[in-house]
Structure formats: structure tokens, C-alpha cells
Amino acid sequence: MTNIRKSHPLIKIVNDAFIDLPAPSNISSWWNFGSLLGVCLIVQILTGLFLAMHYTSDTATAFNSVTHICRDVNYGWLLRYLHANGASMFFICLYLHIGRGLYYGSYTYTETWNVGVILLFAVMATAFMGYVLPWGQMSFWGATVITNLLFAIPYIGTELVQWIWGGLSVDKATLT
């Protein structure tokens, strides 16, 4: 008698991918965080797209758009909370993924590690823009702190802040 998980065509695909996966026996749960990063990224993109459908750049109506999403949009409250908490979960998985790389000495593969560092900077820049740009004045503090950090870069700091924000003070909605 054959086992159904090895003979049925559809169940065999799931069996080969999850149960009888040809992977080394020394892989621990630390190796799951790369996959979790992908899941978190997909959730962030999808919820961000749906939230952007109700985006308002006017500072007078920005907070009203948030309440509109939570009250009037079907499962809008869930979209908002998934997007906010998904960002936190994304960065938790990201830092655990980096920690796993440090623990197992992956920094010795310099090309791969440098690509990871570039991706980390790109993720942080994207998260900053996603945090600062929408909904007007909700993130003055974050924009001010990061603007001051950019200003501290030698030689190019002043020009960089002028180019990004137009000056040291952040005012009104930045997406108009």
C-alpha cells in the first residue's frame, strides 16, 4: 500500500516542498527569516496599494482620510493595522536575518554581504519615504530627526538637505 502523500499528484508537490524537502539537517529555524521577509514585503505592498487608493495630500483633510479608511472602507481598519504592524514585523525579520548572517559568518562572502548592505540601505530609505511622505504632519518628528542626520554628513550635508526638503524645516504635506 502506497502512502497518499507520495502517490497523489497534487499532494506530492506539497510533500516534496515541505515534508521531504532535500535540505541539510543542520538548518535551523534561523533560516526562515528570509522567507518571512518576502511574505512581509508582499503584505506591505498590497496593503500599501489599497491604502494609497484613499490617500489625501491636503494637510487639512489628512486625518479625516485616516478616519475614513478605518470607518467607511470595508476592512479598512484591518488594512491600516496590517500595514503598520507589518512594517514592524518586516524590520524585526530583517534584523534577525542580519543577526543570523553575523552568527554564521556570512560576512566572509563579501559580494553577497555587500549586496545585502545595499539592500538594507535601500529598505531603510524606502521606509523613511513611506513614513514621512503620506498624511501630512503626522511624522514631523521623524522627518526632522532624519533631516538633521543628513545635515551632519560632511561636505555634502547642507546641499543634500536643500535638495531633499528645501531646507532644515519640514512643513505641510510633502506629496502634493
Swiss-Prot record:
Gene this chain is encoded by: MT-CYB
Binding site for heme b b562: 83
Organism per entry: Nyctinomops laticaudatus (Lesser broad-eared free-tailed bat)
Gene Ontology biological process terms, A to Z: mitochondrial electron transport, ubiquinol to cytochrome c
Membrane topology reported for the UniProt record: Multi-pass membrane protein
Job description of the protein: Component of the ubiquinol-cytochrome c reductase complex (complex III or cytochrome b-c1 complex) that is part of the mitochondrial respiratory chain. The b-c1 complex mediates electron transfer from ubiquinol to cytochrome c. Contributes to the generation of a proton gradient across the mitochondrial membrane that is then used for ATP synthesis.
UniProt KW Membrane keyword: yes
Name of the protein this chain belongs to: Cytochrome b
Note in the entry: Heme 1 (or BL or b562) is low-potential and absorbs at about 562 nm, and heme 2 (or BH or b566) is high-potential and absorbs at about 566 nm.
UniProt family annotation: Belongs to the cytochrome b family.
UniProt keyword annotations, A-Z: Electron transport, Heme, Iron, Membrane, Metal-binding, Mitochondrion, Mitochondrion inner membrane, Respiratory chain, Transmembrane, Transmembrane helix, Transport, Ubiquinone
